Amino acid sequence: MSTIGSFDGFQPVSLKQEEEDQPSENDHLSTKEGNSGKDPGSRRISRQQSITKATLYPNPYRQPYVSRKYFVTRPGAIETAVEDLKGHIAQTSGETVQGFWLLTEIDHWNNEKEKILLLTDKTLLICKYDFIMLSCVQVQQVPLNAICCICLGKFVFPGMSLDKRPGDGLRIFWGSTEGWSLLSRWNPWSTEVPYATFTEHPMKQTSEKFLEICKLSEFTSKLVPAIENAHKNSAGSGSGKELVVLTQPILIETYTGLMSFIGNRNKLGYSLARGSIGF
């Protein structure tokens, strides 16, 4: 007599075994590759290599995070500064700005300072601008007809100086150094220095825009004709000055240079992000 619900005659089946017996997609690929007469391993390696792509990073010598540390490179910073300074010049003197540049000033103690230079028909303006607060800190106005000499050349230092800088510079004289007092010469904060020394800004290579406004040769090519025109216009007043352009080494008299060594290594003269503090 048979019993309802009896499982006699049924055999247990392993689902795992059935799954292993079924061909996978990789097996199909291997079969196709085998039919083509090629080694599956080498075919798989060549397929992995084909999905890789090597490209050169733009500006490999200038990492993006380095340029972002300088507030002047932030979007709209230099444009805001120039518009502020143009408005200030228009209100105070009524002159029109012919051009502007972003350079590094090197004072008589070899300290670097970030400066914006603006040129009008009559005046050279050397501006210290705070790119963090977006406000002008100081403006030094130099009449073009007072500039008597321009010196172009490489920087030279006394033998014992700690902070010797390479590269070329530009020095603009608007007075004689013979009457420069010893007290002013040895005062790092003196405002009676009869000249100003400039070199190119470190962010020159970050973009085409900064390449144009940070290039020292571009500034010189505009400054020299402007000074000559100013001298011609003031010739009737009996000044009789002529611009002298020299090509010779530029001496920076820092015999020890410890203060500038520390300041320049830490970029204290620039509006720079320094961790959670920027100054």
Curated annotation (Swiss-Prot):
GO terms for cellular component: cytoplasm. PROSITE patterns: HSAC2 (PS51791). Keywords: Cytoplasm. Residues 72-259 form the hSac2 domain. It is found in: Cytoplasm. It comes from the Eukaryota. Highly expressed in skin. Also detected at low levels in tongue and esophagus. Residues 1-49 are annotated as: Disordered. Belongs to the TPRG1 family. PANTHER family: TUMOR PROTEIN P63-REGULATED GENE 1 PROTEIN (PTHR31108:SF6), TUMOR PROTEIN P63-REGULATED GENE 1-LIKE PROTEIN (PTHR31108). This is Tumor protein p63-regulated gene 1 protein. It comes from Mus musculus (Mouse).
